[in-house]
From Swiss-Prot:
The lineage of its organism: Eukaryota, Metazoa, Chordata, Craniata, Vertebrata. GO terms for molecular function: natural killer cell lectin-like receptor binding. A lipid is attached at residue 225 (GPI-anchor amidated serine). It comes from Mus musculus (Mouse). Residues 1-28 form the signal peptide. This is Retinoic acid early-inducible protein 1-delta. One of its GO terms (cellular component) is plasma membrane. Residues 207-225 have a biased composition (Low complexity). Glycans are attached at residues 38, 66, 79, 139. Disulfide bonds join 37-52, 86-186. Residues 226-249 form a propeptide. Induction: By retinoic acid. GO terms for biological process: natural killer cell mediated cytotoxicity. It is found in: Cell membrane.
């Protein structure tokens, strides 16, 4: 019994490391000059919340919890407000779609402690004249994880259980289309704002937002450094996996 419990803990640890590995490279691409939107859906209550940031700048906050809606930072350029206003209705529509999907998704209630809650992160880097694309990360009750890359129309799950849910969601053509084209209508405004945020000197007196989980340093001028950062993250996680397997032996 004791050996089985230890083995179970090792499998759980390895699974978590694999989840980190799954998202390591994507997180390496998220920086101070990408648009990041965090969506929180708490089924079955009507509680939805959306926060969109560019680095430390909050450009949009939607909440039906306390009925608040803010768009843009008064201390920043008018472009931030324009981006927030452009994204407002598409994100509201997406929240409703996500609410319907998570409410109709069968999950292990022992893992979710009842009704599942959904956290979604959308990361949009400047398109630089190319077709606008984004990365969508889905987290259901910290138990089911999968990612959708609109640029290559590719889905990736963290484990088999997550894959079952992911496959059902990706078979919804209207939902996939909604994810892919949500940012297209606002891409010109977003690119202009991201370009300005790169050119604007960063304040040294401002405390970073708690939602900014990655480095707040400016985006390097080439993609090589970004790729290097992603691969370093993957390498560190791979080393952790080796230790996990060694302890499991």
């Amino acid at each position: 019994m004791a050996k089985a419990a230890v083995t179970k803990r090792h499998h759980f640890m390895i699974q978590k490391l694999l989840i980190l590995l799954s998202y390591g490279y994507t997180n390496g691409l998220d920086d101070a000059h990408s648009l990041r939107c965090n969506l929180t859906i708490k089924a079955p209550t009507p509680a939805d919340e959306v926060k969109c940031f560019v680095g430390e700048i909050l450009i949009l906050h939607l909440s039906n919890i306390n009925k608040t809606m803010t768009s843009g930072d008064p201390g920043e350029t008018a472009n931030a407000t324009e981006v927030g206003e452009c994204l407002t209705q598409p994100l509201k529509d997406l929240c409703q779609k996500l609410r319907d999907k998570v409410s109709n998704t069968k999950v292990d209630t022992h893992k979710t402690n009842g009704y599942p809650h959904l956290q979604v992160t959308m990361i949009y880097p400047q398109s630089q004249g190319q077709t606008p694309s984004a990365t969508w990360e889905f987290n259901i009750s910290d138990s089911y994880f999968f990612t959708f890359y609109t640029e290559i129309m590719s889905w990736r799950s963290a484990n088999d259980e997550s894959g079952v849910i992911m496959n059902k969601w990706k078979d919804d053509g209207e939902f996939v289309k909604q994810l892919k084209f949500l940012i297209h209508g606002c891409s010109q405004k977003m690119d202009e704002f991201l370009k300005q945020s790169k050119e604007k000197p960063r304040s040294t007196s401002r405390s970073p937002s708690i939602t900014q989980l990655t480095s707040t340093s400016p985006l390097p001028p080439t993609s090589h450094s970004t790729s290097k950062k992603g691969f370093i993250s993957v390498g560190l996680i791979f080393i952790s996996l080796l230790f996990a397997f060694a302890f499991a032996m």
